[in-house]
Regions:
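S-adenosylmethionine-dependent methyltransferases
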Residues: 2-9, 20-22, 34-270
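Glycine-biased, low-complexity coil/linker segments
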Residues: 13-14, 30-31
Length: 270
């Protein structure tokens, strides 16, 4: 069931969307292509046994990204055993799989494209879907967006995005919710690296298509995931993004930025 939403956003004292319930994150059994879909989620929020801010500060380093050096993030590195923790160890400390601790290739490519083409977001209301570390949301704010709402189902990402936003001198609002299917008052929707699961992609494609048909710009960064609907989108740019072999099957991923068109002819149409 999707979380309720009211528009405009009711902001909390820190600028976050305070009325939305928290929803737990998917499991991270291995590499990015193996991440399961939102359909597998339990209905209750895992009990947070560890203070998120203290944990993030103790288990990450502040790094500039190789493909987006303008932005610094709190990220896991080989110096921290966050790379090595099993699912059981993460559960023991009350930590959902830490997608927010890594700069995925799709997000890096999309962030690069936004910074290189600020006219796409300048003065506009932006939603960064499945925000993770907040990389793409931060890039949109740096490029001049009027406002950015970062959305993710993992409650830990709220703290990660706040810390990363502060590092970069921008303010990003946050909502912990599954918003797939919602129609919101946003001009631009951004999504980095979201087509890793078939069931998830099957939910996203009609939603993204409907948003584009209503006039929103829908941009996706994808490093060649198995369920990316390439035949349904327009290619905008391609990058060679440095990544870590611990997460991917190579040290560089060819990453493409795509846009869902407002209208895409069906097979046999004129």
């Amino acid at each position: 069931m999707m979380a309720p939403y009211t528009d405009p956003l009711p902001a909390g004292g820190d600028g976050t969307a305070s009325s939305l319930p928290l929803v737990p994150s998917p499991r991270l059994p291995g590499r990015a292509d193996e991440r399961p879909s939102l359909d597998d989620q339990p209905e209750t929020v895992p009990f947070v046994k560890t203070d998120p801010e203290a944990f993030i500060r103790a288990n990450t380093d502040v790094m500039s990204l190789p493909h987006v050096p303008e932005i610094r993030l709190h990220l896991a590195s080989e110096a921290h055993d966050l790379w090595l923790k099993t699912e059981e160890e993460l559960e023991e400390i009350g930590l959902p799989p830490p997608f927010w601790a890594f700069a995925w290739a799709g997000g890096q490519g999309l962030a690069r494209h936004i910074l290189d083409h600020p006219e796409l977001v300048k003065g506009k209301r932006v939603i960064d879907f499945a925000s993770g570390s907040g990389l793409v949301a931060i890039a949109a704010m740096k490029a001049g967006a009027a406002s950015v709402l970062a959305v993710d189902i993992d409650p830990w990402t709220q703290t990660a995005i706040r810390l990363n936003s502060e590092l970069n001198g921008v303010t990003v609002a946050f909502a912990a919710a599954d918003i797939i299917g919602d129609a919101r008052s946003a001009d631009v929707y951004l999504a980095g690296d979201v087509f890793y699961d078939k069931a998830f992609a099957d939910r996203l494609v009609p939603w993204f298509t409907a948003l584009a048909e209503r006039g929103a710009a829908v941009l996706v960064g994808d490093p060649g995931r198995a369920y990316c609907p390439r035949d349904r989108m327009q290619m905008l740019s391609t990058y060679q993004v440095p990544v870590t072999r611990a997460l991917e099957d190579s040290e560089v991923k060819k990453t493409t930025v795509w846009r869902f068109p407002a209208y895409f002819p069906q097979s046999g149409s004129i």
